[in-house]
Design a protein with these regions (language model features):
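...captures the hydrophobic TM-helix bundle architecture rather than a specific catalytic motif
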Residues: 2-187
């Protein structure tokens, strides 16, 4: 999983740190210093990092907090708190996914399509793969919520929730890197 995201970050940084000109322009503008393009490529309108991406960042950070709350509540034997915290975490995961879907809708209709070059390709693949991980994590936490309801988790036996929490925090950290690199620095 980590290496998959490393590949996307690598592609993003390779393309953004040494932007290439389209082949048509390359032949016309080549000189002894070499041709260098701009980043993001001309014609690509990027998202305002303080709009939907920032809201999604806040949502994931809050969900990381509620996930940790759920884990500690189970460890302390506070079942009702764990249920409440897991409901909040799952709800925040669903909110993130819906906002990401809305962002994709906006991107396709107002910003860029997948086929518009390297920036959209890496953007859609990296954020889409992350979004897939959020959906998997939301389902994972939903199963944990069901198991807490059924009293399957105790202070001594809660590995499923602990694994889900580790997974969820991985998803949080990846998003922070995506937010900083793609939305802030990449724009």
């Amino acid at each position: 999983e980590v290496m998959f995201f490393v590949a996307f970050f690598w592609a993003f940084f390779d393309a953004s740190l040494t932007p290439k000109l389209p082949i048509e322009e390359f032949a016309e503008t080549f000189d002894s210093n070499g041709a260098v393009g701009v980043w993001p490529p001309e014609g690509i309108k990027t998202f305002d990092p303080l709009d939907i991406p920032f809201l999604n960042t806040l949502i994931l950070l809050m969900s990381g907090t509620t996930c940790t709350w759920a884990h500690h509540a189970v460890r302390e034997g506070h079942r009702d708190q764990a249920i409440q915290a897991l409901w909040l975490t799952v709800g925040l995961g669903v909110c993130f996914t819906l906002l990401q879907a809305f962002e994709y809708y906006e991107a396709v209709h107002h910003y860029f399509k997948f086929t518009d070059g390297i920036y959209p390709s890496v953007f859609y693949m990296a954020t889409g793969f992350h979004g897939f991980h959020v959906m998997v994590g939301t389902i994972f936490l939903g199963v944990c919520l069901f198991r807490v309801y059924k009293n399957h988790m105790t202070p001594d036996r809660h590995f499923g929730l602990e694994a889900a929490a580790w997974y969820w925090h991985f998803v949080d950290v990846v998003w922070l890197f995506l937010y900083v690199c793609v939305y802030i620095w990449g724009a």
